[in-house]
Amino acid sequence: HLSMNTNGGAQDVEWWKELAIIMGRKGHVTFSFDGLGDTNHLYRQGVNWENCMKNSAAFISKGGRARWEFIIFDHNQHQIEEARELAKKMRFDDFRTKKTGRFFSTVKHEGKESHQGMNRKGQETQKLEKPKDEYINNALKQEKNLVNKYGSMDHYYDVTDINCKSIEKSEIFVTAEGHVFPCCWLGGQQYKWYWKPKEAPIWNMIKDPNNINAIYNELKDIIEGNFFNMIENSWS
């Protein structure tokens, strides 16, 4: 089964129609639409809403299986049901809301009330505010209890058991460059705006990106290779 996540703003309708035919019913595309025409661009910087609608409709028109995934913020929480109805009208197979973990600082390892968006140049863009409590990620609600029990989040990370979702579901993540990772969370560590190129800690494990590139290697060799083993060994 092949799945692809996209903001839906790139390419033209003919490209999306062709993709639907190529994927058939054995795969699906998750369109990350976080709001409607007046709000989606606040998080999806530079994405044109009309293109999103045309491209997703074109994909569905040729039998493509489409899922609408909606990340909830303060600025779009009032649009959830309207977006759900639009997804039904457009014949999306599924509509899912996502309670984001973005209101947790991965630098300070603590919760925060807002999240300052940045572009690739490190410039501030949209400031994202937390939604209502019912839309807060459940894991974020456990922070205070975990700190009280373990003393700090760092100590909790050191002693907690890790249940790898990718192992449980037999999944892998392939970047647009062809790099193979267990999941998108690790793949996304390559290019954080606050790290200079190839200075993020994940590069200490990657070393030569060609070694984990599916263009040059068999998937089996990558999955059974040093990079995946190093990740698993780091848990103990």
Question: Where on the chain are the PLM-derived regions?
Answer:
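Radical SAM enzyme [4Fe-4S]-AdoMet core and its adjacent flexible, acidic
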Residues: E18-N217, D221, N229-M230
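Conserved Radical SAM active-site core
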Residues: H1-S3, G9-R25
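Immediate flanking context of iron-sulfur cluster ligation sites
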Residues: N226-S236
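Short His-Asn-centered micro-motif
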Residues: T6-N7, E168
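Active-site metal-binding loops of divalent metal-dependent hydrolases
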Residues: G8-G9, G35
